[in-house]
């Protein structure tokens, strides 16, 4: 398949710079995967789509204030974006600088540049940075002087309020450099209402890396290599999924990260061996993929030519997805991380759909 098959134009005016004031009052586009039928609702109407006995699964990762601004020894400015914490003193990160970054060079951060670090390695496209002579751990440093890493398409500086807006209300495990944005629409009253209705609620963890913002650079999408991210799916959750399906309930995934985590676990030994699934995954889901776990997906509106729109096409069907996006643009839905959402059911014919290239 050609990358250009997944191109469409989104007016800049539809890119959301801030979320809806009340999380659950964002708009919701509902698409039936089998019929392609579309309905326009508000997010709190999701309560009418999810039934007693269904299992809804969230990604409980928590966003790190992952962006640091500092200086080189020469005085030149640098911007560091955390990819992964390696240990108490070292990180894997991308570095922006006006000039070339050299190995074995120093970087300085914090008040009066008192926090000193040293570039000790390179693992394409990231640098390995070790923080020196600091009593504080890397986590402490980022929590104290880091900035919330808003996506590059939100053309404004991050504000203090983003520290809460760009987190889900159920965040727990610190480790992401981007929010699992489908979950941003859930507030505590909505979660309570789902629970009262008899919907089972559970969690897994996928720590989202900066690779989520990287474009596909191959004309043929099959040649794209996904970045790796750490996933944790408990054995208890796997057994709960099996029991839910056995009883006729549906599995609802909140976000593409949740779906990718579940599919990764499904293809592992953990699925049938009653073991926790804790591994890096680089699963790339695109049209032609047959989904094994999830019956319905809640997701935001994604960038054209992104791995995320390809996942949605694989789940909903290519034609259904393009029609839904056309309808969303026509009706002025808000796009991307702080935008509106979709609720889509699985189209079992999607894996066999022909996409003209």
UniProtKB/Swiss-Prot annotation:
Class of enzymatic activity (EC top level):
transferase
InterPro entries attached to this UniProt entry: QueA, QueA_dom1, QueA_dom2, QueA_sf
SUPFAM superfamilies xrefs: QueA-like
Any single GO CC term annotated in Swiss-Prot or TrEMBL for this entry: cytoplasm
What are the EC numbers? Answer: 2.4.99.17
Cellular location of this protein? Cytoplasm
Sorted UniProt keywords: Cytoplasm, Queuosine biosynthesis, S-adenosyl-L-methionine, Transferase
Pfam families in the cross-refs: Queuosine_synth
Q: Which organism is it from?
A: Buchnera aphidicola subsp. Schizaphis graminum (strain Sg)
Tell me if Transferase is a UniProt keyword of this record. yes
* Gene3D superfamilies, per the entry: QueA-like
GO BP terms: queuosine biosynthetic process; tRNA wobble guanine modification
Q: Write out the similarity annotation.
A: Belongs to the QueA family.
Summarizing the function annotation, the protein's role is:
Transfers and isomerizes the ribose moiety from AdoMet to the 7-aminomethyl group of 7-deazaguanine (preQ1-tRNA) to give epoxyqueuosine (oQ-tRNA).
Q: Which residues form a coiled coil?
A: none
How is this protein organized at the quaternary level? Monomer.
Name of protein: S-adenosylmethionine:tRNA ribosyltransferase-isomerase
Q: In which pathway does it act?
A: tRNA modification; tRNA-queuosine biosynthesis
The reaction(s) annotated as catalysed by this protein in its Swiss-Prot or TrEMBL entry are: 7-aminomethyl-7-carbaguanosine(34) in tRNA + S-adenosyl-L-methionine = epoxyqueuosine(34) in tRNA + adenine + L-methionine + 2 H(+)
GO MF terms held by the record: S-adenosylmethionine:tRNA ribosyltransferase-isomerase activity
């Amino acid at each position: 398949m050609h990358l250009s098959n997944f191109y469409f134009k989104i007016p800049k005016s539809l890119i959301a710079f801030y979320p809806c004031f009340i999380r659950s009052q964002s708009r919701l586009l509902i698409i039936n995967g089998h019929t392609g039928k579309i309905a326009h609702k508000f997010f709190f109407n999701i309560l009418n789509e999810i039934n007693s006995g269904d299992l809804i699964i969230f990604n409980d990762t928590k966003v790190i204030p992952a962006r640091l601004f500092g200086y080189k020894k020469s005085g030149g400015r640098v911007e560091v974006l955390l990819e992964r914490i390696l240990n108490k003193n070292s990180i894997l990160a991308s570095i922006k600088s006006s000039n070339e970054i050299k190995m074995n060079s120093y970087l300085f951060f914090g008040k009066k540049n008192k926090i000193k670090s040293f570039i000790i390695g390179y693992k394409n496209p990231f640098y390995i940075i070790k923080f020196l002579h600091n009593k504080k751990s890397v986590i402490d440093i980022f929590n104290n002087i880091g900035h919330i890493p808003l996506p590059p398409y939100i053309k404004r500086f991050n504000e203090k309020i983003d520290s809460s807006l760009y987190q889900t209300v159920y965040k727990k495990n610190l480790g992401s450099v981007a929010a699992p944005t489908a979950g941003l629409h859930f507030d505590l009253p909505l979660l309570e209402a789902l629970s009262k209705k008899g919907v089972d609620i559970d969690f897994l963890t996928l720590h989202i890396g900066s690779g989520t913002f990287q474009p596909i650079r191959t004309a043929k999408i099959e040649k794209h290599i996904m970045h790796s991210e750490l996933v944790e799916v408990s054995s208890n959750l796997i057994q709960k999924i099996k029991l839910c399906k056995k009883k006729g309930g549906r599995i609802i995934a909140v976000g593409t990260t949740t779906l990718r985590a579940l599919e990764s676990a499904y293809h592992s030994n953990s699925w049938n061996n009653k073991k926790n699934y804790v591994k890096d995954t680089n699963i790339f889901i695109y049209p032609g993929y047959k989904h094994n776990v999830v019956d319905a997906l809640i997701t935001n509106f994604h960038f054209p030519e992104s791995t995320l729109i390809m996942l949605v096409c694989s789940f909903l069907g290519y034609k259904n997805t393009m029609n839904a996006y056309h309808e969303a643009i026509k009706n002025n839905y808000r796009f991307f991380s702080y935008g509106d959402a979709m609720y889509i059911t699985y189209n079992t014919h999607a894996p066999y759909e022909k996409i003209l290239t």
